[in-house]
């Protein structure tokens, strides 16, 4: 998958195979397979086809990648849809752990989510983790769409999500997640490119103001 970051994901148009790499790969594989099975029929998630000790194979889901739609001028629709979908996730008492348009596929006509991907970091936790990370993705990879972030938060609230935390709380959650990923990459390849990338991203995020 062109937008994958930490794992190897390949598909043939019928099935998608995700191979887990890096620290705690087995734990992340078990987490993702468990949540995909648990959430099937409750949220738009791919159907599990096969699980091996190193990979999860799911059925292919046709749809447009969220980041591609942002680049194609559909940021308002995509961010609103992200907000609605996230409220549904949080109603189940879970946190996705890597939430945002980078892990979503959308119907190209209605712009409704057809698949929420990459559940390997899912866990019980506070909503601010997902709210702040979706915002971080936009601020980092699509800064031109930062003015449209209110569409995301407003849709989340309209769909029944709790009150959106303050900028200070969201910023603190972003920094915490960046530190987690810095630690992850440092353990995976000490002194490598991933560690440098996340150190730079942590520094950049630290300098942000509302």
What is each residue range found by the language model?
Residues 7-11, 87-129:
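Active-site acidic catalytic loop and adjacent metal/ATP-binding pocket
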Residues 40-52:
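Conserved HxN/HPN-centered segment at the entrance to the catalytic loop
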Residues 2-30, 37:
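ATP-binding glycine-rich loop module of kinase domains
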Residues 147, 181-210:
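ATP/Mg2+ or Mg2+-diphosphate-binding catalytic cores
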Residues 11-12, 19, 50, 60, ...:
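Conserved hydrophobic "DFG−1" position in protein kinase catalytic cores
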Residues 39-43, 66-102:
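Conserved kinase catalytic-core helix
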Residues 53-65:
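Conserved short submotifs of the Hanks-type protein kinase catalytic core
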Residues 130-161, 177-190:
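Active-site activation/catalytic loop segments of kinase-like enzymes and analogous catalytic loops
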């Amino acid at each position: 998958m062109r937008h994958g970051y930490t794992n190897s994901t390949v598909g043939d148009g019928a099935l998608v195979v995700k191979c887990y790499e890096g620290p705690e790969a087995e734990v992340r594989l078990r987490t993702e397979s468990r949540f995909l099975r648990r959430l099937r029929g409750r949220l738009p998630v791919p159907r599990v086809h096969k699980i091996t000790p190193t990979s999860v194979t799911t059925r292919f889901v046709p749809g447009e990648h969220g980041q591609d739609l942002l680049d194609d001028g559909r940021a308002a629709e995509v961010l609103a849809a992200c907000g609605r979908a996230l409220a549904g996730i949080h109603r189940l008492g879970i946190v996705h752990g890597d939430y945002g348009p980078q892990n979503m596929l959308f119907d190209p006509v209605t712009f409704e989510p057809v698949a929420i991907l990459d559940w390997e970091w899912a866990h019980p936790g506070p909503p601010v983790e997902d709210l702040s990370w979706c915002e971080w993705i936009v601020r980092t990879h699509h800064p031109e769409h930062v003015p449209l972030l209110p569409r995301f938060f407003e849709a989340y609230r309209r769909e029944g999500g709790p009150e959106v935390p303050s900028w200070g709380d969201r910023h603190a959650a972003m920094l915490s997640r960046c530190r987690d990923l810095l630690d992850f990459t440092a353990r995976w390849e000490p002194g490598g490119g991933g560690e440098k990338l996340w150190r730079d991203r942590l520094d950049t995020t630290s300098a942000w103001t509302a």
